[in-house]
Swiss-Prot record:
Pathway where this protein functions: Glycan biosynthesis; glycogen biosynthesis
Upper taxonomic lineage: Bacteria, Bacillati, Actinomycetota, Actinomycetes, Mycobacteriales
Name of this protein: 1,4-alpha-glucan branching enzyme GlgB
Matches recorded under SMART domains: Aamy
UniProt keyword Lipid biosynthesis, yes or no: no
Protein species of origin: Mycobacterium ulcerans (strain Agy99)
Length: 731
């Protein structure tokens, strides 16, 4: 009788409770049962393969058939006194056997430092620890290639890895929890390089759910929901851009941003196709930046993308993560900055995503009065929990580092800052000081901004914050939130209300166009004419303009010139640059045919190109956006004529006079005060024939004399076309 035969039955079966937990999928330490274990003068190898017909342990050239104990557990006792290198040959009914290294013989792939930093919320490169990562280990029998998986689910009864590799069986790949960290981990040899997977989580609530990886770098194309192992081999070509970016401060640079929803800009294009077509379009029309509506994976293609289900994965609808890198790279090499919308305020309740991840409120706040956003039917992140805060801060760094993103536009900041945001009187709980401010969210935003700006000098963070919260763009070192800029929602609402009115009524609402200057320098502002203004029955900018098509076109041109002249950076949603007439549709995309059918659309598009070019070439329009020294009124009070006029001042001493006639009629012989006498060149006239206007103007310029007017030492007499803007500079 061989020594192996003598050992048959020795220690083969684990403790009954261990086997029961394995079968139930709720064992916290399957590695303590499975794999190779020393028992005095012999070793027992156990493998859990519930659907296998036969399992053989291979040691060197020797083969040892394993005994089926019960419920898919196989075991064999071997006469060795030291842990050995071995493989498993596994056979299933009606299939060829295959040989693989045993997943349960490998040490944890996360170290104590990773787990400690995560528990404290300070792991800035958390995506390198959690999620799915291809790895290789050198053994006596050669190199073992595979993928390590790690997921945070501290309250789960058990977690298993499922995927194509095991026929989506929840029993063959149980994971182990690493100490008290709540992180479950498993290295699986020979896992496919781009394999699909999920985690089967036995929740604390008794519910078994199949979950996408919160740290997945890639996903299936929706509506499928599996995560995909993803490795980047992209070679960047934007080194010059990245070097120069680190030396710049966007607050003091020109920023004219084209806001894009990738799926509907030109439907059907991939990231690689967009890298050519979108880049060429943006360059041709002289924008400095693009802002992409949320690129992170989201379940509903017909949405803007603000309900994110995979925060670390660019949507797979348009290609792979490396394809998205190619888009960013192409834009950078063309001199275009890339901002992405980022959504840390809330997340959807899809049962396969983050919500109730381990059967308890994990990523979301446990108090329903803080953990749910009623308006949107979503969960709200628990900003006070270190691991959740770490998940989000690391995510911001991930997009900036891994995709060379130049900025994050943070969505729905107001909903984060106020505990009573859009809640009934009895639907919220106060903070520790009995106030309505969400102190944990404030701390999170400060940490995110400080960390991002330290890690990547030259990037921009922009808040969509619709209230008067003080210090949104103040540095965190003096108590601010630390954003670079915030959207000026007040300017947007007042301006659109004004220009939507018939000109004969505008004089009664003149204050709507002057009020913004009372607070224009209280924060660093972006002036948004965004996607929010072209949905839900709001129509389009074109549709808001009163009158005939000729009048609408003139009104839109003057509005855009006013936006570009006003202190603040510019943002314009796609389609508005050529006066799209129909409201946005994710199915139809933009109405590019308008450029073939009417001169008004071409005129507006030509104007946008020209004002972008003029804007970038004249620092008076951008270098002092955030300081009163960059702006002075000529006349803020000519409501009778519906005229506004002001000067923009550059940090180099340059000046631009900006005059707006929002009346529906021409003003001839209009005297305007100017800072110096002499020739003033007409830099822009929105009524010019090249913009399909009527051609009324000043023949390219005016001569200012030393006649004081409007409190200025000089003045000139101008012709102001109806619904127009004029920009003048000293010749």
């Amino acid at each position: 009788m061989s020594r192996t035969d003598q050992l048959a039955g020795t220690h083969l079966a684990p403790e009954p409770n261990d086997l029961a937990l394995l079968v139930a999928g709720s064992h916290h330490n399957p590695h303590g049962v499975l794999g190779a274990h020393e028992y005095g003068d012999h070793i027992v190898i156990r493998a859990f393969r519930p659907h296998a017909a036969e399992v053989i342990a291979i040691v060197g050239d020797d083969r040892f058939p394993m005994q089926h104990i019960e419920s898919g557990l196989f075991a064999v006792a071997l006469p060795f006194v030291d842990l050995i290198d071995y493989r498993l040959q596994v056979s299933y009914e009606n299939s060829e056997p295959f040989t693989v290294a045993d997943a349960y013989r490998f040490l944890p792939t996360l170290g104590e430092v990773d787990l400690h930093l995560f528990a404290e919320g300070r792991h800035e490169r958390l995506w390198e620890a959690l999620g799915a990562h291809p790895r290789s280990f050198t053994t006596a029998d050669g190199v073992v290639h595979g993928v390590s998986f790690a997921v945070w689910a501290p309250n789960a009864e058990g977690v298993s890895l499922i995927g194509d590799f095991n026929g989506w069986s929840g029993s063959e790949a149980p994971m182990r929890v690493l100490g008290s960290s709540g992180v479950w981990e498993l290295f699986w040899p020979d896992f496919p390089a781009d394999g699909l997977y999920k985690f089967r989580v036995h929740g604390a609530d008794g519910v078994v759910s199949e979950r996408a990886d919160p740290f997945a770098f890639g996903t299936e194309v929706p509506p499928q929901t599996a995560s995909r192992v993803t490795v980047s081999d992209y070679s960047w070509g934007d080194g010059d851009w990245m070097t120069e970016r680190a030396q710049r401060n966007p607050v003091f640079e020109p920023m004219s941003t084209y806001e894009v929803h990738l799926g509907s800009w030109r439907p059907g294009l991939s990231y690689r196709q967009l890298a050519t077509e979108l880049t060429d379009y943006v360059v041709a029309h002289k924008f400095t930046h693009v802002e992409l509506l949320p690129v992170a994976e989201h379940p509903f293609a017909g949405s803007w993308g603000y309900q994110v289900t995979s925060y670390y994965a660019p949507t797979s609808r348009f290609g792979t993560p490396d394809d998205f890198r190619a888009l960013v790279d192409a834009l950078h090499q063309a001199g275009i900055g890339v901002i992405v919308d980022w959504v840390p305020a809330h997340f959807p309740k899809d049962a396969w995503a983050l919500g109730r991840f381990d059967g308890t409120p994990l990523y979301e706040h446990s108090d329903p009065k803080r953990g749910e956003q009623l308006d949107w039917g979503t969960y709200v992140f628990d900003f006070g929990r270190p691991e959740v805060r770490n998940f989000l801060v690391a995510n911001a760094l991930y997009w900036i580092e891994q995709f060379h993103i130049d900025g994050l536009r943070v969505d729905a900041v107001a909903s984060m800052l106020y505990l009573d945001y859009s809640r009934p009187q009895d639907g919220w709980t106060p903070n520790i000081y009995e106030g309505r401010e969400n102190l944990e969210a404030v701390q999170f935003l400060q940490e995110m901004n400080a960390t991002a700006h330290k890690a990547a000098p030259g990037i921009v963070t922009i808040a969509e914050e619709s209230t008067s919260w003080p210090g949104v763009t103040r540095p965190t070192s003096i108590g601010g939130l630390g954003f670079s800029m915030k959207w000026n929602m007040g300017w947007m609402h007042d301006t659109l209300d004004y220009v939507s009115r018939d000109p004969i009524y505008r004089s009664y609402h003149h204050h709507e166009m002057t009020f913004s200057m009372l607070y224009a320098f209280s924060e660093n502002y972006v002036l948004p004419l965004s996607h929010d203004e072209v949905v839900h029955g709001k129509g389009t900018l074109w549709g808001r303009m009163p009158g005939s098509n000729h009048t609408k076109a003139a009104g839109l041109r003057s509005l855009l010139a006013y936006q570009w002249a006003h202190p603040g950076k510019q943002l314009l949603f796609m389609g508005q640059e050529f006066g799209q007439r129909a409201e946005w549709s994710e199915q139809r995309g933009l109405d590019w045919f308008q450029l073939d059918e009417n001169g008004f659309s071409n005129g507006v598009l030509r104007l946008v190109r020209d004002i972008n070019e003029i804007y970038c070439d004249h620092c008076a329009l951008w270098s002092q956006d955030t300081t009163p020294e960059g702006y002075s009124w000529i006349d803020a009070n000519d409501s009778a004529n519906n005229v506004l006029s002001f000067l923009r001042h550059g940090s180099d001493g340059s000046v631009m006079a900006c005059i707006f006639n929002f009346a529906g009629s021409e003003h001839s012989d209009y005297r305007l005060g100017l800072p110096i006498a002499g020739r003033w060149r007409e830099v822009l006239n929105t009524d010019a024939t090249i913009y399909n206007g009527s051609g009324v103007g000043n023949f390219g310029g005016v001569d200012a004399t030393a006649e004081p007017w409007h409190g200025r030492p000089a003045s000139a007499v101008l012709v102001l076309p109806p619904s127009s803007a004029l920009w003048l500079e000293p010749a």
